[in-house]
């Protein structure tokens, strides 16, 4: 499978982060859970879609397990630990009552305020190799005669277990001062989407020019419709047309609905590369900001705490916090996130040294 970057997916990730920040700043109420659902499904999709040919079989090797965990660790932990240390030093009362609490955060046994999202994602990455190994064993030893059609079985199994784990949680994690359901079902929905897109990409689509145009137009309209649903389904908009769902917090209670919308959006973004809506979500600015979205997510809450007294909730608070979050994320991406992520792939101190030398030393 060709590892070609799909810019439209960056637009999904950035929009998800915007929804989360918008809720935390009181700009768009109760839509943060929608953003979380988009992120989890997208993470599951990418785990399969860019995993190379037969990604489930690579985990037959213990070396691949270790490689995978090392890459994920260097991608996530340096930024996370830096953020935890920063919060603890300047604002220890926010979510850390003691050094023991800091240790629990470091090991993801506890996750205060917005860190619960990252806690969920880390556990999803811990489970991913096991899920892929089970699929690989099934495909290699039981479904081998089906060839590539065995991926339909993977899809059915992943969606079936996603539905099961939604109603019978695999486990609970302590995050944001309460026991949170482990949302691995959203991750599995994304994985199923990844297998579906892989299969469809392998097919020969001999479409006429007219059919291709119609398909692109339809995909653009579907993406626009999904985007509008994720935005306008906020209670702050619905109440203006006489629909009052305040207190129901539908995003958490019915996040599988938004997971399905995320699946639809992803499929359209993968197969549609033309049209104004697709180009809008895949524009270079969105791609750039999406790459920094991890830093934006980690540090926006710190700015939110500082801005509470100075700027009231709403549009101004959102714009100010988003701007400064982007500035912080930009700096940290260059000096920490990118080099550590690359180091996790190559484990080369030489390349790491060359990166920092090129960054700070001008010939």
Regions found by a protein language model. Give the residues of each.
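Juxtamembrane loop-transmembrane helix junctions in multi-pass integral membrane proteins
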Residues: 1-7, 27-30, 68, 173-176, ...
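Membrane-cytosol interface segments of multi-pass membrane proteins
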Residues: 1-163, 170, 221, 287, ...
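Alpha-helical transmembrane segments of multi-pass integral membrane proteins
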Residues: 89, 187, 191-192, 216-342
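Alpha-helical transmembrane segments in multipass membrane proteins, preferentially the mid-helix core
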Residues: 129, 133, 192-203, 265-274
